[in-house]
Amino acid sequence: MSHDTKPNDTPAASNFLRSIIDQDLATGTYAGRADKQGDPLPTVITRFPPEPNGYLHIGHAKSICVNFGLARDYAGRCHLRFDDTNPVKEDTEYVDSIIDAVHWLGFSWDSAQAGSTPHLYFASDYFDQLYKFAETLIERGVAYVDSQSAEQIAAMRGNFSEPGKPSPFRDRSVEENLKLFREMRDGKYADGEHVLRAKIDMTAPNIVMRDPVLYRIRHAHHHRTGDKWCIYPMYDFTHCISDAIENITHSLCTLEFENNRPLYDWVLEHLRDAGVFANPLPHQYEFARLNLTYAITSKRRLKQLVDEQRVTGWDDPRMPTIVGIRRRGYTPESIQLFCDRVGVSKADSWIDMSTLEGAVRDDLDARAPRSVAVLDPLKLILDNYPEGQSEECSAPVHPKQPEMGRRVFPLSRELWIEREDFNENPPKGYFRLFPGNKVRLRYGYVIECTGVDKDADGNVIAVHANYLPETKSGTPGADSVKVKGNIHWVSAPHACEAEVRLYDRLFNDPNPDAGGKNFLDALNPESKKVVTAYLEPGLRDAKPEDRFQFERHGYFVADRVDSQPGKPVFNRTVGLKDSWGK
């Protein structure tokens, strides 16, 4: 899916951001702008600015869909910008994974104009400009070098009930501040010896505005700039300036950055007054982050799961990471559909996991080819079927899409059926296979159970039946014998034997990390079960990330990591119904 398309569905849930953009378009807030080359700029430019210090998760997917989706819908553009200002935690591995995730979700930052530069940026590309702008703030008397330790700065900042106290270095002269800042840049000081702070208001009710740090010393190798810099700008300084440099119109953040918006405006307004930027400036808007039940998205918690081998890695199909849900079999379209359904609001709320699973289920129901898989096999022997013989049966690839054609598979004397489809002593209302009862083999014949084989412990190891030759599905005699039960099967000598991983929710508590609980206590011991299954023979040719509905079971995907040619491994993506609903 390209960034020019969106999944078909009912109208999207409410999105207050659209109202803001509509108002800006109506008043011409960002009309008539041009870039440095004189080319006209779109009236809507958004950006997705991840820090490359980990793998993206489902919450990031919402932000990606919001930013890229709005740009798409308003014929604008969205930039992918890496906020790579912390060299200690960042790595090109994460850069590559984020690029792959955005592309996989169906979006692109490439300009629609032929020959134009793709809008992929790094905050580190602006380090020279950021440094220059920091000096501009010093020269205007609104930034100073503070020589207190981080602990001292924190102690002097105050709290919600007490105002902060000014640093003893707050009134250094412009000349001294410039000298110290340049010496910081030149590597004359150790980490933590000095910081550059904005001079705003140590009594501000908003603690963010109590002389926030703009630059800190960090002698560390950067993944792009190497050892050129030993001072690095803070997020709040970098973010707004990067937006202005890139001509962003609507800077969309989650609610935790709401208190940072005054600082965003403060930096840009001071640089505008210094002649660096001009009106209209970018504006920051906040929307509610995605809180999903039965999941955690804390990077620290997810890392703990990986480090303690509670999961197999960042791409474990039970993880909420984009690489995890992709491996689980979720589709990009289902994620976009989910984000459209939950909408964008100003207030935090919890979205039930069933909403996400429902979007995945609806998307796959419309597209996934059908197939048969026996996950808990029990041998069924048709005693009156000729030995060594087989015949073809057929079924639609998709019952609602005849244009997808039909699939053909063999029936023989020995079959595999689901163990739960036989019961020697059935309860009332059980219409599947039991001694003396008739059922239909789906797409095949009506059969009558005649007996069982048992092992020394009395366990049923095989079921015997006779088939009724005139009752094959699709023939004139198909309805000659009425039965209530219908079971699926695969031919034993022809079946594709495969490993199938039955995944479920990683946690059995809807809020595993709430109220001081140890989230590890909420791990679901049934979140992964591995079985050896017997599948319709055609599944032997399944390629990685091919998706199917296993009839009566759910939706499955050929694992993109472990599947081999002729030997696929399947992951359960989601069941046919919500098994967690009350």
Curated annotation (Swiss-Prot):
Give a GO molecular function annotation for the protein. ATP binding
User: What Gene Ontology terms describe where this protein resides (cellular component)?
Assistant: cytosol
State the oligomer form and interacting partners: Monomer.
Residue numbers covered by motif 'HIGH' region: 50-60
**Renumbered ranges of motif 'KMSKS' region:** 296-300
Q: For this protein, what is the EC number?
A: 6.1.1.18
Q: What is this protein called?
A: Glutamine--tRNA ligase
- GO BP terms in the entry: glutaminyl-tRNA aminoacylation; glutamyl-tRNA aminoacylation
Give the encoding gene's name. Answer: glnS
Q: Where does L-glutamine bind?
A: 83, 235
**Binding residues annotated for ATP, in chain numbering:** 51-53, 57-63, 254, 289-290
- Tell me its family: Belongs to the class-I aminoacyl-tRNA synthetase family.
State the compartments where it is located. Answer: Cytoplasm
Tell me the InterPro entries matching this sequence: aa-tRNA-synth_I_CS (IPR001412), Gln-tRNA-synth (IPR004514), Gln/Glu-tRNA_Ligase (IPR050132), Gln_tRNA_ligase_bac (IPR022861), Glu/Gln-tRNA-synth (IPR000924), Glu/Gln-tRNA-synth_Ib_cat-dom (IPR020058), Glu/Gln-tRNA-synth_Ib_codon-bd (IPR020059), Rbsml_bL25/Gln-tRNA_synth_N (IPR020056)
Under which main EC class is this enzyme filed?
A: ligase
Query: Is Nucleotide-binding among the key words of this record?
Result: yes
Q: Name one Pfam family in it.
A: tRNA-synt_1c_C2
Annotated keywords: Aminoacyl-tRNA synthetase, ATP-binding, Cytoplasm, Ligase, Nucleotide-binding, Protein biosynthesis
Q: Which reaction does it catalyse?
A: tRNA(Gln) + L-glutamine + ATP = L-glutaminyl-tRNA(Gln) + AMP + diphosphate
